[in-house]
Amino acid sequence: MSVTIQGNTSTVISNNSAPEGTSEIAKITRQIQVLTEKLGKISSEEGMTTQQKKEMAALVQKQIESLWAQLEQLLRQQAEKKNEDATVQPDKKEEKKDDTNTAGTIDIYV
């Protein structure tokens, strides 16, 4: 009996600025890579029964799934933060425009 594991093991994260959590994302990505390599080597391990190999593979797969969930959450948080920052900046610009329109104007009542 053989255990075949298929999956996407490469993750590309590119961002010109280094947002918060980038090091955490890199750490999680590296853990996923290490576990994926480990998963591929389980079937060739000697000294383990087929059942033990299946259990080990299932455990490693669960760890990978958990790390993917953490990675997705971090990426979602970064996207939300980026969106919040983008919506705050236009408001500030509008306030400045309003200030310049009223600056230097004198109201005279007769």
Curated annotation (Swiss-Prot):
Residues 1-23, 78-110 are annotated as: Disordered. It holds the Pfam family FlxA. Residues 1-20 have a biased composition (Polar residues). It comes from the Bacteria. Residues 78-100 have a biased composition (Basic and acidic residues). This is Protein FlxA. The gene is flxA.
